[in-house]
Amino acid sequence: MIIKPRVRGFICVTTHPVGCEANVKEQIDYVTSHGPIANGPKKVLVIGASTGYGLAARISAAFGSGADTLGVFFERAGSDTKPGTAGWYNSAAFEKFAAEKGLYARSINGDAFSDKVKQITIDTIKQDLGKVDLVVYSLAAPRRTHPKTGETISSTLKPVGKSVTFRGLDTDKETIREVTLEPATQEEIDGTVAVMGGEDWQMWIDALADAGVLADGAKTTAFTYLGEQITHDIYWNGSIGEAKKDLDKKVVSIREKLAVHGGDARVSVLKAVVTQASSAIPMMPLYLSLLFKVMKEKGTHEGCIEQVYGLLKDSMYGATPHIDEEGRLRADYKELDPQVQAQVVAMWDKVTNDNLYEMTDFAGYKTEFLRLFGFEIAGVDYDADVNPDVKIPGIIDTTA
């Protein structure tokens, strides 16, 4: 079939398998052209491995460090008549290129929050890899069925303690509008912490450690975003921020557990990028459109692959890690450059419907958004007939 982008709200409901493959190849080429990660990981588990930062971590480990990788994700395959999810096509492409390089790459499709998927992952590590020396936790999910209670909990994006009114960008209508969000209830805050906080990360590490599949010296990291003053009311000081602060609490006991065997656990702070998750946050499209303009003019703009490759090479496995007073690894320092933030703040209130394209890089934002789904990739013929039914050989599909 011939597949064109169809966008509804903050989701593109179509995906392009050839475009997704080309996007993965671009990321692989970035890593191979920037050289190996010295003393990098060799057997890696990525939880949330199919898109965004998790996919970038899988690519960086495999093609920057020659690592065997096991990826866990929740995606949907395509059929003859309907495209699958972008994450499915990304993972199919990754496995294809890894196999060409002689690297082990296997994937598990299912609910990473469940005990069942954790057990299947452990069994697969025992059978195929023995032990893993790096665990990357990169899950973004709107809800979680708690494995111990069976309760399905939802996360909420709201301020805490007060209602907040801010400028937003309606990406469908391409208009600037005021958005008011009411404060989260305590139940909503608790739910967000349960879905987006550190409990599941801790459950994963406990399960892997108890099963004896963590190598001596194993490291783990969970990805987070902090942002700066302009996004704090809705992000760091909001319900999502409460979940992110929970990561900072949980990492302490995870670090203590791994340190016994010479390992380490860190929260890694990454910059704001266009992802399916960030496009759902009301103020992020405007913030990102301004940030891209400023950072591109400065020559410091980065996407997922630049961020994660740099994080692994410089901070997780390098001699001079960027680390803050909380013990977090920082890859967001170019975004938080005071000059960059000052320029974003100065332009924030000046953007109007009429000057949106001149004042911001909304055009770049839209391109990045479509690239998530395999569109707007250079060299891809979008008028060609493509087969949306792409197989992932050897996948362990717990959803089938």
Swiss-Prot record:
Pathway(s) of this molecule: Lipid metabolism; fatty acid biosynthesis
Binding residues for NAD(+): 48-53, 74-75, 111-112, 139-140, 244, 273-275
Sites where the protein binds substrate: 225
EC number(s) stated in the UniProt entry for this protein: 1.3.1.9
InterPro entries to which the protein is assigned, alphabetical: Eno_Rdtase_FAD-bd_dom, Enoyl-CoA_Rdtase_cat_dom, FabV-like_NADH_b, Trans-2-enoyl-CoA_reductase
Function comment: Involved in the final reduction of the elongation cycle of fatty acid synthesis (FAS II). Catalyzes the reduction of a carbon-carbon double bond in an enoyl moiety that is covalently linked to an acyl carrier protein (ACP).
Family the entry assigns: Belongs to the TER reductase family.
Name by which UniProt lists this protein: Enoyl-[acyl-carrier-protein] reductase [NADH]
GO biological process entries: fatty acid biosynthetic process
Keywords: Fatty acid biosynthesis, Fatty acid metabolism, Lipid biosynthesis, Lipid metabolism, NAD, Oxidoreductase
Gene: fabV
Enzyme category, top tier: oxidoreductase
